[in-house]
Amino acid sequence: MGKDTIADIITSIRNADMNRKGTIQIGSTNITENIVKILLREGFIDNVRKHRERNKYFLVLTLRHRRNRKGPHRTILNLRRISRPGLRIYSNYQQIPRILGGMGIVILSTSRGIMTDREARLEGIGGEILCSIW
């Protein structure tokens, strides 16, 4: 049985967000770095640091929380893995789903790298739908 690194990232971010943790540490691979760059660019996380420990690289993510009188609120409302190792889901650029009418984002793996649904529509390419965030 293989290891699903994308599902691991999504689960650890979702769990840390639900428990209002400030930082989390995930293993660093090319796919995880590209997904984290998209999350940083879209404003779902505040900061990313690369950390080395015993010849292994980790990414330390600082999650973004809104403050109010009761304490920190969640920023990431929902993260969902769409394509998984047992059931891959592909889409061309015309049929990429819109999440909440464009309020959320879909992360795709294309022939030109990992990108959001907006970037894929602008470039006119489709790919594997990895996850959705809203």
From Swiss-Prot:
GO-annotated biological processes:
translation
Can you provide one Gene Ontology molecular function annotated for this UniProt record? rRNA binding
Which compartments does it reside in? Answer: Plastid, Chloroplast
Keywords noted in UniProt: Chloroplast, Plastid, Ribonucleoprotein, Ribosomal protein, RNA-binding, rRNA-binding
Q: In this entry, which stretches build a coiled coil?
A: none
Identify the main location.
plastid
Oligomer status and interactors: Part of the 30S ribosomal subunit.
Function according to Swiss-Prot or TrEMBL: One of the primary rRNA binding proteins, it binds directly to 16S rRNA central domain where it helps coordinate assembly of the platform of the 30S subunit.
State the family named in the UniProt similarity comment for this chain. Belongs to the universal ribosomal protein uS8 family.
Instruction: Tell me the HAMAP family matching this sequence.
Output: Ribosomal_uS8_B
Please state what the protein is called.
Answer: Small ribosomal subunit protein uS8c
Organism taxonomic ancestry: Eukaryota, Viridiplantae, Streptophyta, Embryophyta, Tracheophyta
